[in-house]
Amino acid sequence: MQGTVKFFNDAKGFGFIVEEGNNKEHFVHISGLIDEIREGDEVEFELKEGKKGLNAVNVKVI
């Protein structure tokens, strides 16, 4: 999947990615990152079921 980083807080270690095509927001934790990300970055990611729903994992900048 692809999307855009809407928000990421380095200090707290989490943020949100907006999925391309349907504008769904997905939670991303710092542990799910392959690359460092910043707001506005275009990324590829996978979704994995977490405690509170789907989380973005294996996130890398494209």
Residue ranges of predicted features:
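Short aromatic-glycine-enriched beta-strand elements
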Residues: 12-17
